[in-house]
Amino acid sequence: MKKMFFTVAIAVSIVSVTTAFANPDGLQQKKNENQFAESFKQLSRDTAWEQKEKVDLKFNTYHPQGMTKIGDLYYMSSVEILEKPVKYEEPRDGYDRTTGKGIGHLFVFNQQGELLKDIRLGEGDMYHPGGIAFDGESIWVSVAEYRPNSESIIYKVDPKTMQPQEMFRTNDHIGGILRDGEKGNLKAVSWGSRTFYEFDSKGKVLSKDSNPSHFIDYQDCESAGKDNMICSGITELPQQGSSTGKYELGGLALLDMKTMEIEHELPISLVSSQGHTVTRNPVYLENTGEAIKLFAVPDDDKSSMLVYETTKLNTK
C-alpha cells in the first residue's frame, strides 16, 4: 500500500511561516526543567487554577487528541471520524469492534487560534493519532487503528519543515508517545494507558509493563525534565442515581520515566463549556518559574483552547 502523507498549506505568507517553523524555541521547552517536577509536586486537589485565556480555534478541530507547544506555535493531533467503529456482540479475530474510517491530522495554529498547517497522517485503518510530545528536535506522533489491541505507525515530524517521517510500526494501539530527551528511548502508552511500552528508535520493544494505576487513563504525556514525565487524562465513572450519563474525572500525574512509577498525582475538577473535564484529551503544561500554566482543548469540532495558571508555588 502506498504511504499517505499530505501537507496542506493554509493561506498564510510562506516567508513568515517558514521563519516561524525554522526557529522553534527549543530552549524555552528546557527552561526551568530542573524545578518543574518539584513545582508540580506542590499541586493538589485544593490548588486554585485561574483561567487566563480562552482562545477560540478558527477551524474544525474534529476530535482533538494531543498537544505540544514550540515557541509561540501550538501543535495538536486530532482524528476526523468518517465512519465510527461499531462494537461486535462477540469478539472477532481478537478485536472487539470494527475499524471504522477516518483521517488523522496534526494541526499547527498560532496564539490567535488561526490554522497555519494541516498535516495528514496515517494509512488505511490506522487513522487515529494519539498524545504527542516534542523532544527538543522533533514532534513524536502515534497513529493507530481506532480500537484496542490493534496496530500503530510511529512518526516524527520536523517542526522546521513540517515533514513527517515514519519511524516504525508496532502491534498494539499506541495512544501516546514521547522521547526520553533528544536521543533517548521512546516511552509509550497503550489504549487506555493500561500498558507501558519502551521502544528504541527502530521500534524494538525494550520493555512492556502493566500500568498499576487505575486512577485515570493517560491521554497525553510530555517530558518534565530530570527523567520525569507528566501525563494528563480522564476516566469515566457511572453517575449516581437514575442518570445514564458518565461522570468525567480528570487528573494529572508525574511519573519517573525510568521506572514508570508515579511520583505525584492529583484530580482536576475544571470543566469546559460543553461539560467536559479539561484534561479529557490535549493538555500541555508549561513551567514559567513562578507558576504552572495548563493549556487544554477538551471539546470537539468547535473548540477553544483554555489557558489556566496557578501561582503561589514555592520555587526555591
Task: Please place each PLM-identified region on the residue numbering.
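A short helix->beta-strand "capping" segment at the edge of beta-propeller domains
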Residues: N34-N60, K117
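A short beta-strand motif characteristic of beta-propeller blades
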Residues: Q51-L57, E114-G122, Q163-F168, K204-S210, ...
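Loop/turn-rich, solvent-exposed surfaces of beta-rich toroidal or solenoidal domains
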Residues: H214-E261
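Beta-propeller blade signature
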Residues: D93-Q112, S152-K160, G245-T259, V307-T315
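Residue position within the beta-strands of beta-propeller blades
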Residues: M76-S77, V141-S142, A188, C231, ...
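Repeated scaffold domains used in trafficking and secretory/extracellular systems
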Residues: Y62-G66, G124-G131, N171-G181, H214-S223, ...
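Short, conserved, GDST-rich strand-edge loop motifs in beta-rich repeat architectures
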Residues: S77-K101, A144-P148, G233-L249, K302-Y308
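Short coil/turn segments that connect the beta-strands within blades of beta-propeller domains
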Residues: G71-D72, G136-E137, E182-G184, K226-N228, ...
